[in-house]
Amino acid sequence: MALRACGLIIFRRRLIPKVDNTAIEFLLLQASNGIHHWTPPKGHVEPGESDLQTALRETQEEAGIDAGQLTIIEGFRKELNYVAWEKPKTVIYWLAEVKDYDVEVRLSREHQAYRWLGLDEACQLAQFKDMKAVLQEGHQFLCSMAA
């Protein structure tokens, strides 16, 4: 059976968008262990939790951002399936916008750094093909909503 994890692709919009549609910035966290990879906040589902409850709890634990500081974007849910530590893993992501552009990020010990990044920079830091793809799909979804 695959390990199951859930997370939020957190983003904010610059107050003054640039002409090239780089107004969207994604929050990525750098892991403290392993290869120090960059991902959105995510974590394993605990007994009795729904997937979305897990994503919200993990965001609060890993980035210090509470559910009340976020707006979940309807219509976007992506499932990634891959092998991690020689075990199959499923991760489900939703898009969530911070209500305050200057929201304070408070990292847990699981992470050593965070960055707000435009799509191209976020994809450069995201080392895994699946993560890059979900960031691109999320960005495309958000841009299509604005059109």
Swiss-Prot record:
Motif, Nudix box: chain positions: 43-64
Cofactor(s) required, per the database record: a divalent metal cation
Catalytically driven reaction(s): P(1),P(4)-bis(5'-guanosyl) tetraphosphate + H2O = GMP + GTP + 2 H(+); a 5'-end CoA-ribonucleoside in mRNA + H2O = a 5'-end phospho-adenosine-phospho-ribonucleoside in mRNA + (R)-4'-phosphopantetheine + 2 H(+); a 5'-end FAD-phospho-ribonucleoside in mRNA + H2O = a 5'-end phospho-adenosine-phospho-ribonucleoside in mRNA + FMN + 2 H(+)
Source species, domain of life: Eukaryota
Transmembrane segments: none
Activity regulation information from UniProt: Inhibited by fluoride ions.
EC number: 3.6.1.17
Residues with the N-acetylalanine modification: 2
Enzymatic class: hydrolase
Chain's role: Catalyzes the asymmetric hydrolysis of diadenosine 5',5'''-P1,P4-tetraphosphate (Ap4A) to yield AMP and ATP. Exhibits decapping activity towards FAD-capped RNAs and dpCoA-capped RNAs in vitro.
Protein name: Bis(5'-nucleosyl)-tetraphosphatase [asymmetrical]
Organism annotation: Sus scrofa (Pig)
